Amino acid sequence: MAAANKPTPNLDHPTLKIVKEAFAGKRLRATEYRGQTTLIVEPADLHAVMAFLRDDPRCDYDFLSDVIGVDYLDYPAETLGRFAVIYNLCSYKRTDRIFVKTFLNPSIPTDGIEEDPALYVDSVTDLWPGAEWTEREVFDMFGIRFRNHPDLRRILLWEAYPAHPLRKDYPLRGRGEREQYRVISRTDA
């Protein structure tokens, strides 16, 4: 049986060279998976890189499609941090897409809702106003906070909810929420 050929990553995305030249003194990395290129930036550089990707005419990423939170707890491969925030950017003029990822490591235990100073990134709502609700969802589900967000509060769960349930250390069956809070069925509504 012949060994399967592993595809070699194609890191020839035209945006990578432009960004690396513009941010020559910054630590930038790039990965490619199944034809999708991801630019990895440090949290402190995120906002500047995102503004550049939007405003530089050679990049012109005019549309933020999504903001995603990821918890890499117990991930089989080594990662640069426990949590990641991933931005899906599109350029309609150039019919191009790139993902931008930044990693965060918690500085306190993650089993509650305590505010962790290490789980902060700058909001991009000033660049793409549509990021407002997706950033709120990442905050609600993962506890990652966005500096300068115009309305950072929970979007799916109530304010007093005692956890961020998409964290991998959150129990699958919850922490007694079904017993503590009344569930409204269709017949009750």
Q: What would you call each of these model-derived segments?
A:
Residues 1-189:
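Terminal low-complexity/charged segments
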